């Protein structure tokens, strides 16, 4: 085992910008050892398309790098494609390749080979088109690590937003917000802010579900019947929670100035504000896993693959956050 465990980078959808991100990142020397789990042939082809001269160095279970690669160099754990890739053109035959890169990364973290995973975007649709049920990175890694409950959190400079519910139709959100779910999510958020972000006593702002946080029950009773009593019980466990507050006033400097995270009830309640504040410089973090996993905050951008018009800002933030969470910063 090397003295400094490497982090691993999975490029996601091979026809998207994930391979481009890996190569563009490799132009700079990295502060920590970093291995891309990808097809070496794909990276070589994409580098040629981008006009980049990047040395691809082999890495694998018998020879993990213990030192960072220099500029214009990338360590690669070669993972074969099922079929050749054309930038921007999806092919379901490569769905198993995408999942194999994630499986290698997750298992390597579990056995102690890797310090953390940074993921580039996958295309859920083409994986499902291949006949493989797939909801996303978060659910896949939760199953791989035998984790019952995980929490999605996005972060940018000065703001962290975690979600009680994630990819649900809006009509199903209220029913999904149960006392049990709210307890589990809040406990995971609090625990990981302490253990992975080094915040001794996190201060968490909690959004209400309804406009004006229910207006005393006139605009919905979820705050009165579920959210408020659940938060009261969690406060007795020593968790510092403020709310439920109306989301339209919670996301103002007055409230955000002294908080460590916001807990939003649903996807589009919290994430538009965060993405407006930090799009291109935000990171997606999976809380509750026994491993460190961060991701970029954008999609596969098939139309930009192979063009060189790709911003690596979100990937850099994802790397920095993974280093921080693992104690390697």
Swiss-Prot record:
Cofactor note: Binds 1 divalent metal cation per subunit. Can use ions such as Zn(2+), Mg(2+) or Co(2+).
Annotated catalysed reactions: 4-(phosphooxy)-L-threonine + NAD(+) = 3-amino-2-oxopropyl phosphate + CO2 + NADH
Gene Ontology MF terms: 4-hydroxythreonine-4-phosphate dehydrogenase activity; cobalt ion binding; magnesium ion binding; NAD binding; zinc ion binding
Disulfide bond annotation, renumbered to this chain: none
Assembly, per entry: Homodimer.
Alphabetized UniProt keyword annotations: Cobalt, Cytoplasm, Magnesium, Metal-binding, NAD, NADP, Oxidoreductase, Pyridoxine biosynthesis, Zinc
Gene3D superfamilies referenced in this protein's UniProt entry, alphabetically: Isopropylmalate Dehydrogenase
Cofactor annotation: Zn(2+); Mg(2+); Co(2+)
Membership in a protein family: Belongs to the PdxA family.
Residue sites binding substrate per the record: 137-138, 275, 284, 293
Database matches in NCBIfam families: pdxA
Additional notes on this entry: The active site is located at the dimer interface.
EC number: 1.1.1.262
Enzyme class (EC, first level): oxidoreductase
Localization, UniProt: Cytoplasm
InterPro entries: PdxA (IPR037510), PdxA_fam (IPR005255)
Any single biological process term in GO: pyridoxal phosphate biosynthetic process
Binding site for a divalent metal cation: 167, 212, 267
HAMAP family found in the cross-reference section: PdxA (MF_00536)
Protein name per the record: 4-hydroxythreonine-4-phosphate dehydrogenase
